[in-house]
Amino acid sequence: MAVNTYDVIVVGARCAGSPTAMLLARKGYKTLVVDRATFPSDTISTHLVHPPGVVALQRWGLLDRLTATGCPPIDTYAFDFGPFTISGAPGTDEAPVAYSPRRTVLDKLLVDAASEAGAEVREGFTVEDVVIEDGRVTGIRGHGKGGATVSEGARVVIGADGRHSLVARAVEPEQYNEKPPLLCGYYTYWSGLPMNGRFETYIRPDRGFAAWPTHDGLTLVIGGWPFAESNANKKDIEGNYLDMLELAPAFADRVRAATREARFAGTAVSNFFRKPYGPGWALVGDAGYNKDFITAQGIHDAFRDAELCVD
């Protein structure tokens, strides 16, 4: 039988898990947050934080830390539909800008904030199993790198471990509003492609691509096509990616003058909602609901989930 060593155990320490652990610890709950990764480390993400997410960082006292890393603000969103472009400020007077911090920076900042708030952080810890007793989640079993399996108990276990959540698999929540993958997208980073504080997206028939600035003078450029074309297009990702950019010739010229600084990364994701709570457990972030990344809402939604869960 698991002993309730902790009030809450959070599985996953990235954009959903660390804020959840931080806010719980600030309220005085004895909190453990675990992740199989160590930090700083990267993950597949286009890492755009829309203004509502920026406001959350400000509420938590973390925005100044982010801006101190040199992440450039994004003060204009422009949507190019071909015949016309709609552009304007992305936010409000309270939250006028967006940011796109690299996950190596943002996730480390959030993990450190959770630790400073009093949460116990275990990096490099792999959860093997969720402990369920009499229909209620009571803890986890797992191990550190090279270590023996240990059990930890808690009143509540929160799954912040992404769309392939081990916690969700263990508790088997109702899943609804399911949609298959609709889009396949790839992104990479370019130097010599100044954005001057702009997020630019281009909407074309069966294609969409966008660009925005991030750390170290780099610009993230992502493009996508229908999932039905994914198998054919993955045979030449770079060629199909560059061909797609030609649908906006002036933008393609800017990319040709730039230098690619990283490999292509990409994915296609299914869309679903899961019931996010039950006896002794809850789900936050992509573990609770996952949506096509064309919205770039994942980080903002993870922050919102953290606050809703703790409240």
Where do the PLM segments sit?
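Beta1/beta-strand and adjacent pyrophosphate-binding region of the FAD-binding site
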Residues: A2-A16
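A conserved beta-strand/loop capping segment in the N-terminal third of enzymes
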Residues: Q58-K108
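Predominantly flavin-linked oxidoreductase catalytic cores and closely associated redox partners
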Residues: A113-F251
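Conserved N-terminal glycine-rich FAD pyrophosphate-binding loop of Rossmann-like flavoproteins
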Residues: T38-Q58, L62
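Conserved Rossmann-like nucleotide-cofactor binding loop
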Residues: A16, F39, H164
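FAD/FMN-dependent oxidoreductases across multiple families
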Residues: T69, N231-D311
